[in-house]
Amino acid sequence: MATPQLSPGVLVREVDLTVGRADNVLDNIGAIAGPFEIGPVEEVTNITNEQDLISVFGEPKNNDAQYEYWMSASSYLSYGGVLKVVRADDDDLKSANAGVGIASTTTLKIKNYDDYVNNASDTSVNFLYAAKNPGSWANNLKVCYIDDFADQTLGVSTANLSNAGATVGAGVTAAISGVLPGSGSTSVFTGYVKGIITGVNQDADGASTIDVKIVSRVSSAGAETRIDYAEGDSFSSFGTSNPLFFVNSVGVNTGALGSQATGTTAASAVDWYDQQTLGLSNSTIFWSTLAPKPGTSVYVSDRQGHNDQLHIAVVDDNGDVTGIRGNILEKHIDLSKASDAVSNVNAPQRTYYKDYLRDLSANIYAGADPLAAADAFHGTTPAATGFTAYTGVKAASFAPETASTNQSGTVAQDKQFLAIGAKTYTIMGGNDYQTSGGDGYKADLGKLITAYGLFSNKDEVEADFIIMGPGCTTEAESQAKANFIISISESRKDCMSCIGAHRENLVAAAGTPGGSLLTTEQQTTNLLRYFGPLTSSSYATFDSGYKYTFDRFNNRFVYIPTNADVGGMMARTALLAFPWFSPAGQQRGVLNNAVKLAYNPSKAQRDRLYPKRINSFITSPGAGTFLFGDKTALGFASAFDRINVRRLFLTVEQALERAAQAQLFELNDDLTRANFRNIVDPYLRDVQAKRGLIDYLVICDETNNTPDVIDNNEFRADIFLKPAKSINFITLTFVATRTGVSFSEVAGRV
């Protein structure tokens, strides 16, 4: 090849002939969908252990045998696998919420994070706060809110505050004079402290109060300086020694700027924040014990904004969720009303309260802005916390900020955000599945199929075992569910479906924790009738089991299906041995957490079941309960009618498919083909050494990569495998011979 250099020099080139390799395949990922108590709806969630299952999807419930779904998931996890779980939807499923102007809206359903972002995160929604996911679990949770509404509560001895000029939005001033400490110096100051009234509480007996937000300090020469409230500091707060003067933009009780004809001495002056509680029914918790007073964040202050901070706490007031009254589930401090706010400590963490709760709260989403309008039902009225200007005439310096431009969700620049003070919202109206007659957990077949459909795309969701769990109400629905799950595996061709029996075919009374009321002959006939019409597939397994196990959450024994255990056994076999070993038998097929079986078939009954693709679970004295069959659901004789062969091919195919992807867009020549053979051959030799193959052959040369194949931009490799077979049938022949007979005369003849 001619050098690309045009003048003397050294060109360094690299050629990589190591592209691609056959990586190990860890196939221990199960998948199940069902009507769980809590958790995101129609969203695939990774679960690694039972504690994760409890945290994300709640505990098992007695209603509608929902525990069968939950305990099937738990059973699979007990074998060492990981699980992908989808919570199925339902038309009756609704999210608990605090409505806008009402207790709650009855139509709200926020399925998951994406559903909130796409459909429920703008300000036009009809809820203020909503549970993170649907269901009754969040009913009566309290969302406690507080912002920088006021600095002080001042007592005013009058029965008519408006006549005195003390109305929301009006200014309040008090004359001050004295030595003002500065930075390394002092100065004599004469002027007044200026604030804005944010709340009034009129008392008929004259013990009225006003809530005041400190705004600025104004000198006698008219120079105005923004200040922050400092309790007990006469230059930064109001006291009981100097008269209060109420002033609005047109001059209440007209007089010089910042004064009026007659002053009113405050009867009392207390810190507003110190008086605020979370507003709970069963306990009294002061906000000051949880966090410092909200004020202005560094981000907003740097942009000449004010009063953006707020705190939010989520409290289990009645103990319905945690069993502890007044239990604080979450506490979110120093959130912001500014839509562009960023944490000064954990940048670039966004602190806008809706974004923050969306990403970091475990229990709630935020909806409509409570600062957008007054809410008579919840008793909130947004109040201005400052004036439009801080110099000049009353018309500007005592005109409250415009409400529409200072709501939550606006950018920080030059904003003086409105406030509503301390408010507690009760979220309610959450409903469970098919709630007629009480909280239910009956999953609709159509919704279950939609949920399982989320596992269909193998490029998006990794799955090795799709677990059916329990069947549906009728046998026909159970068969429809089973066939759909099998179709997923047939379409993906990289996983297996674990199909179980219809409950009423084995246990006569659904939901009854007692023993089976059916004879074994009836159970056998029922199983043959149920499994007979199901789709023939080597990507599925059928089993006969329902096991009797203890439900520690409801303190009782229950029957649950064993198809999740079959998936778990295959995962355990891959972890402890290799995927191409059979998961059945006393070594690898032992059933976890089983007291007894609903159906323990005899040899004669197994002889009827096994030819019909049904693997039995049996209990054997001295050996325990284990899987006694390793057939796939294939309806005809083939090497793929055994689980270990199908699992061998799944493992090899996945490993070599990844290796083949590295050959895409390479040149189809001897070098590429040799490189691919050098990847495949050592891998298959290793599988053979580990007892997965009897023999193999790899053809990837000019015999199958003909000129026509090459011209069609194709690459072909033919891989022939002789899979190892599991032992299903054992014959022991004992022959008695006469003393004088030589064994060579009779060996092989009987």
Predicted feature locations:
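Extended assembly-interface regions of large multimeric machines
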Residues: M1-N318
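Conserved aromatic
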Residues: I47, H332-I333
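Short, cationic low-complexity segments
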Residues: A150-G155, A175, L335-V345, R738-V750
